[in-house]
Amino acid sequence: MVVEERKQTIVFGDLTCDSVAGLRTLVTVKDNPLLISFFERVTTGLREEIGLLPFSQRQRFIRFTTFEELLARVQRSTCPHPALEKALACTYQLACFIRQYTSPGHKYPSTQQTCLVGLCTGLLSAAAVGCCQSITDLLPLATHTVLIAFRAGLFVADVRDRLEPQTGAPLAWSVLIPGLDGDTASLTLQKYNEEKGLPATSAPYISTYANTGVTLSGLPSALNDLLDSSCLPKNRALTIPIYAPYHASHLYGQKDIESILRKASATEFASYQCQFSILSSITGQSIQVDTFGALIDYALNAILREPLRLDRIVSSLGEALLSDSPIRGCTIFPIATVIGQSLAAALRKHGAPDITVDPCMNSSIAVRDDRTSTTGHLGHSKLAIIGYSGRFPDANNNEELWQLLHEGRDVASITPSNRWDVKTHVDPTLKKKNTMGTPYGCWLKEPGLFDAKFFALSPREAPQVDPAQRLALMTAYEAMEFAGLVPDSTPSSQSDRIGVFYGTTSNDWGETNSSQNVDTYYIPGSCRAFIPGRQNFFYKFSGPSYSVDTACSSGLAALHLACNSLLKGDIDTAICGGTNVLTNPDITAGLDRGHFLSRTGNCKTFDDDADGYCRGEGVCTMVIKRLEDAKADNDPIIAVILGAYTNHSAEAESITRPHIGAQKAIFEKVLTSAGVDPYSVGYVEMHGTGTQAGDAREMKSVLSVFAPETERPRTDAERLFLGSAKANVGHGESVSGPIALIKSLMMLERNEIPPHCGIKTKINSGFPTDLMDRNVHIAKQPIPWERPEGGVRRIMINNFSAAGGNSSVLIEDAPVFEPKSKEAEPRSTHVVAVSAKSSTALIANIKSLLSYMNATKPELPSLSYTTTARRTHHPFRVMVSGPDLPEIHALLENKLASPTVQNRARAAQRAAFAFTGQGSQYIGMGESLLNFSTFRSDIERFNGIAETLGFPSFLPLLESGNGDISELPPLVVQVGTVCTQIAMARLWRSWGIEPCAVVGHSLGEYAALNIAGVLSEADTIFLAGKRAQLLQEDISANTHAMLAIGTSVEETRSLCDGLEYDIACINTPKETVLSGTNKQIDRILDILSSTSLKKTRLRVPFAFHSSQMEPVLEKFKAAARGVKFYEPKVPVISPLFGEVLTSKEPFGPEYLARHCRETVNFATALESAKADGVISSALWVEIGAHPIVSGLLRNNLDSTLKTVPTLQRNKDTWKVLTSSLSTLYESGVDIRWSEYHRDFIPGLSVLRLPSYNWDLKEYWMQYVNDWSLYKGDAQFLKGTPGLSTTCVHKLVEEKKDGNKITVVGEVDVLRDDVDPFVRGHRVNNLPLVTPSVYAEMALVIGEYLRKQQTKLSGTLVDLQHMDVQRPFATKSKGKGPQLLQCHVVLDCETFQGSVEFWSVTPEGKKLVRHALASITFPDAKAAQEEVQQRAQGIMKEMDDMAARLNTDDRVQKFTGKTGYNLVSSLASYDPEYMGVSSVLLDSGRLEAVATVKFNNPRTDGVYHVNPYLIDNLGQPALFVMNANDQADLSKEVFVNHGWKSLHFYKPLSIQKTYRSHVRMSGPDADGLYGGDMVVFEDKEVVAVYKGIKAQGVPRRLMDYIVHMRDDTKAGAPAGGTLNASQSAAANPAADPSAQADSDNWQAALKIISEESGVPIAELSPEAAFDDLGVDSLLALLCASRFREELGLHYESSIFLDHPTIKELEAFWKQGAPETGAVTVSGRDAVLNSMFTEAEAEVDQDKNSSDEDRSSLGTSSYEVISPNTTETTPEITKTSSPKISATSLLLQGNPALPSTVKTLFLLPDGSGSCSSYAGLPRIHPSIAVVGVNCPFMKTPESYTCGIDEVTQMYITEIRRRQPHGPYALGGWSVGGIFSYHIAQQLAAQGEQVSELILIDCPVPKGLDHLPRRYYEYCDTIGLLGDVNGVKRDPPPWLISHFEACVNSLHTYHATPFRPNNAPRTQIIWACDAIDKHCEPKFDRRPDDPEGLKFLTSTRTDFGPCGWETLLPEEDMTLDRMTGANHFSMMKGEFAKRLSEMIEGFLMIGN
């Protein structure tokens, strides 16, 4: 009896199943280790596969680390990559199988009773399952199969994109037509394809045959056209989610299969034997192959080349079940397919009995409810250290550290004075409070040196930043250079996968140094969390940022955290290290008093007299990756970390004592986890602090593990050495572990154990005495330590902390790699790059590299690789190329000598592509480029497409260097040329060179259209081939010719008048190409032979662009009808139309036919592109076999235009390429060097080049006055000792710092005793502090200091070089104090002092420096004797002048009153200032004698010299200059400009009468007059004024200043609104002659200096504004000040257009822009002062409450500098003490008479008016003011509603314009603000005449926007794009957007009252933000309407809801075609926007 058996059929599905959803269910299974292992293997494999891809392919994949992350991101993606789809489908099928057959009770299927079926992708899974007999066998093969599926999908995606580019969401490539049989479908398709003339690559085809219908596949556009026709029943078609072409024999060949499998290359699996019956999806029969390799080949053929025959599978299965076999029943197990039931039904229909379907393998059923919380297994990767750098005690770099270690030096020394003063802080008795007993430490050489510009820190911020933080930045950069780490260049170097970990255990800088003057940057500068945080911010790392404090083990604990993050998969790269910079004496005092520290010097580690540790400094950084990632990235692996761990000595008797058991436990834990024998560790770097207890305990714990006495001793091959770096460089505390690790790394690198220098006397007696017996050693001299053959050396680094923690790290040698083959390097020429952020650094970097090359003679390919692909590149850059090192060396030396080395490359230059036409081809023209796999694979694929289309192979054109090209058919040449050009362009693009425009000459336009995205690759090849084919078939070759002539079209027509010819090409205005028959061309040549014109007959078989083409045009048009044309992704410069094309409408069959026949007007096309700005400043890359078009480009555009070729005939390809790359690189193009080198990596290595040469400057805030010693003392809490006079009310500071004494005196100028001095002296009715008050303050403090210093006994105070820079105008009384401070710093060695006068806030914050001076202390007696000797002569001159009064007409006498009337135009005086009673004046000699007697003298007050006296005694000098006979006060008046010296020999009395004599001379070169004045009391000299300076001021300027007088200004109310006249005074009328020139360039430079905070001395020509911190906001500020102070109308974009000082200066001096406000010569300091005095009134109540602007480099008080003209900068605020809005003048000037309207623009969601900076000038009569949100940079404070914030806006608007009519507007939500403001102003009775709403939503409760929207905008560059350069947005930007939306969320606008509603203009953008972007924005069904407003294409351009708020009849509606919400504010769209606004505002004007 025959036993009937059941057959089981396992059916693996295809891509139609949702594999991701199934996998997301399976990954929740945590109790199946084999399944988890499979997912981990797949994840690792896919990451590696993607990482090996070219960048152009890699960037299209989502990034992931875990399998769960991969699934989540694929599920969210709207367009998953076919390679991932296919891989995940295969993964899902195999995972379901693994899950089922690892479940209890399930064995691997029986080979006899099981049949496997694979549908498409499922055939791969069936092959893997069928070649195994257990799950254990299956795991590696399953992973390999998934990767084959990935590669197949990658290949399919490539073919898909070549056939039809993806332009949005993916479209289906397959449709199911139920009920249609195969034969009918085949005939239908054949007929349809012929009728449409579709190329073979575009024609739909049958991909699946089933009993119930067929599946058709093809291009989505072709399928849609097919279904739209009447050929097929569209209503029955079902779309299948297949998004690429499969089962297409016309698209894939066997070579493609081989290519896929060649890349799979796992030969160990190929021989696996097939164990199961697997049905063919082609024949339905069992596949007759034996091995896995053959099965996979068959499967790929079935997937790619053969249709899926479901009908045959059903038939075959049915026959098997109906056969005589004992198997009578069948169970179908479907996996990842829904075909189970239909297959069962079909089998039953065939008569098969007992068919069941068991869905148990589907994931949802397989998982059921047996999920557990068991976690999955984590990987145990080894970790690679790939880079390190540091600053160490007495060693500024790694090499210096090794040198001192090698020499065994102890670098402990006395504490440097810049840390603290050992004389005051060290007290061995410790009796003095807060002192320490040790003066020793191990110190960094120059901890304050830092390159602030490199890291974009302002000179103000840099000193406040902790030196540890600064040095961490620099060492991190150096370590990354060491490692060759370029963020975002590889999968493991992605910025969001890099974490930063630093150990730091104190805040010394913040506690001691920067806390002495807490400022804006105190927190980010001093808090240790910012040490790693600053790294993340500057380097843009988005991974974790940890600051670790575990006391002394902090650095290694940070490394432990970093290792865990790497092993867990949280990050892929770790930057880790430690810092310790000692500036706080308290910590040292505390450690010393806690008995930690040695009093005798350094750590005496292992010494018997060890008495504590010595504190040490250091900053170290290392770069770590997982070992497999480091290998994959070709990183320089220095050592491998086998394990790291941290524990705690919880059982110790004291928290500060180490515990032997805990230390032993940590060693054992690390060794066990790493699987390492303790005896294999050859060196232990011990903690070794040098304490008796600590050293002994550590030694015991180390020996107990690594050399226990109870076990066998170590052999000689196992010798163990011990040591500690602390004996050399002290105990670095938080950096001690990293220093020890770096020492260990260098030991491995240098094969040496350095000597231990800690034993000063004898070894610690507490150590075991049998160390030698145990073979344990302490090196006393350098010991060679070579790596054993075939083995590794291992080192344990131990670190413990005073807080009880222990951290240990185990490292070993890096893996030994096989010697790399040098034969693989085909490149004959190589590039070497050097770059820097400044010219000085660049020069230093070049010199360093030259020295390195001389010393090491590196391999040139690796040198090229390291300097390009493994370096971050900066704006100052050079590149050279050559075949060998000597040539590279010589070229670099030439660069050093070239002046261009100072030049900065322009940022992110654009390149345009020009495609060569006919005539440049030659055999073998692309042969060398085939070495690039990207180029080679493109060529192979294009050749396959050409052959598929029926064209011959064009490979002979490229591959052979022999033969004549004329022997090749035109079809081969033309198709080969087009394909080669496309491949070349794609090669350039793979290197990061994306075209900004394309142009093709003749045949070259086909490749240009493909690269522009207009044509797919398949269609391009079809069109080029079809055209050439038609030419070959329908036109006779060589019957016509083409002739190039060196002349214009017009001259050609004149010379060839009456002849027949066609103008084929107009290449340039002087180069023309003719076409015609041979006879016609011969005739033309005869005529031209008598001319000198250049003429060349072209070697072409046809006369293109002539009548010869006409026979093929209709056929060509017909053939092109089946081609699809797309929107250009880049502008196409069309020689046919002579214009730039940016839409697809012009393209089509007609265009191509005309292109073939009509003239190539290359010259006009380029002229149009230039006029349209498409190619402005672009570089050109010529794509072709030989540079022909380059010359045309230069002749048409600019002879200096930079063009680079790709190839050049008869020239080495590598030489051409490297030269071109060098030109692009030096021009500022960012090249993707990793892609350039990718194919040659096996022969390349990362060299250890010299580190970057920093531009170092000292930034240090000195700890002063020893205040740590007095903290808490009563004396410490007291104020400064008292000193009080009338003009110095108190001393606010008195301190001594070394040899310097600082004294600061303060006066309240509004106090009753001082106020009269100020109000009694007025300029244009403004009370100004006179120089006499400054002088009195300085004299008082000088006298105070003189009396303090015994050495100054017998001296007098001499006040010298008084220079009043900015006037000090007083405010109204009753407004609180108005404080002026005098700062005197005296050098006690020279006894010379500097003096500065500052206005300050009541809190003491400096506002403006008003004057400078100096003081000296000459011997009083000697000085008086010297002047008294001259007194007799002076008195004789005075008597002689009196005698000449009646005889010399030039001598005259007048009363003081007359004199004051003469100078009244300068100033007005109270009677107290009018003390000159008479003047005797000699006009010829400019000499005067004056009598000074005071009116109504005040006798109260305490003075050194009464200010009235000082002023009155100096007045006669002005009388001399303004009252002499030559003076013409109608033209010029003279003002006082200070003096060189002023001193008094005795006290003066205001009740006495004095005589003075003065004689002036001049002018000098600066136009100054000078002289000395001597003051007499009777015959005694009592005072001398030396070097009095006076300068003339043009009267017109004085009149202008007088006209600006505003008597109400000084008393303006605190509310602060100005009336119209005030506004005019603040913004003077324009001087039409104002223009940019050399004079006001200095003024501009001063403005830039003040706004950036960078001293003028540092504004070197090469200084880049980016590096100076001139961002968009600062650029606006500078431009606003240029406009208002210099009258120069420059836009803020000049800082982008001219990015360096040098470029801006050159532009500045070229000519004059529009002018606005008047300017005064920047060279004239006195004129500046006079000009400013008229504007100097500033309400100090307002300013004292202003936000500190010093971060911008200037105070809101600042008005004028001594060398430039400056008015108060226009970043003004309301006077409210609360936060207030600010505004900037963006265009025009409201004060100009020609200004008829001021438009106020409110900020958008960014809060910044910089959004409007790109608007070109609207109209000369319109001023534009941009308003900034008060919460712009502090969005966390933006919690108020719209009413509150708009009130702040209104206050600022009314400050500028008190009354209407107003013009308001705004973009985006700025329009909402402007609407609400308009309503509020109308409610206040003001008129709003115009309202402009720019793409603004109706305010009916704004929707909250999802975070993904902001992230998307940032990703595509909308938030940080500057001139096409993607930059990171400011950190506050997105937060402000969100805060703004929160504020407006509840605002529902009410309608405007109709009778006072403004005229309204509404301007709409038309396009969605992602119209031209990839990827598209992730739109979701639940998106709020507000999001749709921003992201959707507009269709309604009406009022769109605004008509409910404003009268529609008063609206003007405009739209911006082609622009989206963001782009409408930029570029050409911004120009159109300005024009629209102008048209609206100028109605009626």
UniProtKB/Swiss-Prot annotation:
Induction of its expression: Expression is induced by the developmental and secondary metabolism regulator veA, as well as by the cluster 27 transcription factor znf27.
Residue ranges, annotated region (N-terminal acylcarrier protein transacylase domain (SAT)): 10-247
Limits of the Carrier domain: 1635-1712
Enzyme class: transferase
Modified residues (O-(pantetheine 4'-phosphoryl)serine): 1672
Residue ranges, compositional bias (Basic and acidic residues): 1739-1750
Gene Ontology terms, MF aspect: 3-oxoacyl-[acyl-carrier-protein] synthase activity; fatty acid synthase activity; phosphopantetheine binding
Disrupted gene: phenotype observed: Impairs the production of asparasone A and causess the formation of greyish-yellow sclerotia rather than the dark brown sclerotia normally produced. Leads to a significant decrease of resistance to insect predation and increased susceptibility to the deleterious effects of ultraviolet light and heat.
The enzyme's E.C. designation: 2.3.1.-
Domain Ketosynthase family 3 (KS3): 380-813
Region (Product template (PT) domain): 1640-1709
Ranges where the PKS/mFAS DH domain occurs: 1289-1599
Region (Thioesterase), start-end ranges: 1798-2039
NCBIfam families xref list: PT_fungal_PKS
Free-text note regarding domains: Multidomain protein; including a starter unit:ACP transacylase (SAT) that selects the starter unit; a ketosynthase (KS) that catalyzes repeated decarboxylative condensation to elongate the polyketide backbone; a malonyl-CoA:ACP transacylase (MAT) that selects and transfers the extender unit malonyl-CoA; a product template (PT) domain that controls the immediate cyclization regioselectivity of the reactive polyketide backbone; and an acyl-carrier protein (ACP) that serves as the tether of the growing and completed polyketide via its phosphopantetheinyl arm.
PANTHER family: FATTY ACID SYNTHASE, NORSOLORINIC ACID SYNTHASE STCA
Name used for this protein in its record: Non-reducing polyketide synthase pks27
Species of provenance: Aspergillus flavus (strain ATCC 200026 / FGSC A1120 / IAM 13836 / NRRL 3357 / JCM 12722 / SRRC 167)
Gene name of the encoded protein: pks27
